[in-house]
Amino acid sequence: MSFTMARYSSSSSSASSSSCGCCRPCSRICSRSSAYTLALGLGFVTLGTSRILLLKFSGNEENKYDYLPASVNLMAEAIKLVFCLVMSVRVIIREGRSFKDLGCSSGASFLSYLKWSVPAFLYFLDNLIIFYVIAYLQPAMAVLFSNIVIFTTAFLFRVVLKRRLSWVQWASLIILFLSIVSLTTGNGDQHAMAVHGLHPAHISTPSNSCLKYTHLHQVHQSHNESYWSRELWDSQLIHKLNSFGLGYVLLLLQCFISALANIYNEKILKEGEQLVESIFIQNSKLYLFGLVFNSLTLLLHADYRNLTLHCGILYGHNVFSVALGFVTAALGLSVAFILKFRDNMFHVLTGQITTVVVTALSFFLFDFQPSMDFFMQAPVVLLSIFIYHSSKMKDPEYALQQERLRVINGEVFERSRGDGEELERLTKANTESESEEESF
């Protein structure tokens, strides 16, 4: 009996010591995960705010763009692709893997590769629409109205990812929608105004062939009656659409496209074997398609193609537009990390901080003069967002996925070796517990 007690005490002490040993790395991982989460959130808010401001500053006196918006997106996609390819090569060399992982060596891998074309095309549309949204609306109204992305994200969460929402969350979404509609029908100065005094010169001087082409193009347009009739019809149509609220229609379309792109991207980032795959290898495939789609815009449009061939891709660009390309690239990378190691709701929540920052800056930078309705309805928008996030419904499947991702969150940068043993052990343990419950 004494032998039994001694064995029990020794096993208990060893178990307690092992549990303490497990707690220490766990707490270290959790603190590291919190630090990475805070860094992701701050980076996303800073980059999101900078992007909105640069979009506004890069316009001309007529609140239009001297450069082609597609060229900015093409520049951003190229920067992201080069960065992810360099990091992917680093990961492959460290893990001793084959470079075939960056391509497609079979029919099945080719079909899997094509999955990344869907979010790439949606992001292409999203990044293109935002230029015209900022041209039609004040930045403060644009970011406030873009909160409707919470509604579209929640709807797609339920349909695509089968996520559950409580009745309180649905009620808060309805309040959010009605508040945003009330904001858009207010009497404040909601339409965009050009920023005076912040229009720097172009970074490149047009060549002789460029000047000759633009001059001939203007002469051709001035003698083309069909062009003027088409321009008159377009201006009348745009005026009618603007009075109808074209900026809000475009922003509503962008909210749906953005939510769909982020949800589909999160789905393929985390499904099956992709959960433990390097984010740089995954994003290399995504940004390759993004580069193709943005290149097609410049190639298929006759005016864009001729202007790019004669004047170059940097024609009309200024310091703000070039900075916009780098900020857009960094913002896209931060969104990818959020979708991989957090989720869409964290992405949407941090976006609300961007809303507050941009709205505050609009008072000082863009002469934003809101009506009394704005001050009454804006707090309701933020309050409904708070109610939505404070009344989350427990979803066992989502909690299980977050538990599996917790190890990756804590070792987001150390994980480049790609062993993934802890994740496999955790997955195996969860699978065994599920099978025991089913048998019971």
Curated annotation (Swiss-Prot):
Protein name: UDP-sugar transporter protein SLC35A5
GO biological process, one term: transmembrane transport
Main location: Golgi
Region (Disordered) residue spans: 1-22, 419-440
Family membership: Belongs to the nucleotide-sugar transporter family. SLC35A subfamily.
InterPro entries named among the record's database cross-references: Nuc_sug_transpt
Source organism of the structure: Danio rerio
GO MF annotation: an example: pyrimidine nucleotide-sugar transmembrane transporter activity
Topology feature Cytoplasmic, residues: 1-34, 88-104, 162-164, 265-278, 340-345, 389-440
Cited Pfam families: Nuc_sug_transp
Cell location: Golgi apparatus membrane
Spans traversing the lipid bilayer: 35-55, 67-87, 105-125, 139-161, 165-185, 244-264, 279-299, 319-339, 346-366, 368-388
SS bond list: none
Record function comment: Probable UDP-sugar:UMP transmembrane antiporter involved in UDP-alpha-D-glucuronate/UDP-GlcA, UDP-GlcNAc/UDP-N-acetyl-alpha-D-glucosamine and UDP-N-acetyl-alpha-D-galactosamine/UDP-GalNAc transport from the cytosol to the lumen of the Golgi.
Catalyzed reaction equations: UMP(out) + UDP-alpha-D-glucuronate(in) = UMP(in) + UDP-alpha-D-glucuronate(out); UMP(out) + UDP-N-acetyl-alpha-D-glucosamine(in) = UMP(in) + UDP-N-acetyl-alpha-D-glucosamine(out); UDP-N-acetyl-alpha-D-galactosamine(in) + UMP(out) = UDP-N-acetyl-alpha-D-galactosamine(out) + UMP(in)
Subunit composition and interactions: Probably forms homooligomers.
Glycosylated residue positions: N224, N306
Sorted UniProt keywords: Antiport, Glycoprotein, Golgi apparatus, Membrane, Sugar transport, Transmembrane, Transmembrane helix, Transport
Superkingdom as given in the UniProt entry: Eukaryota
Encoding gene per record: slc35a5
GO cellular component terms, semicolon-separated: Golgi membrane
Annotated membrane topology: Multi-pass membrane protein
Lumenal membrane side: 56-66, 126-138, 186-243, 300-318, 367
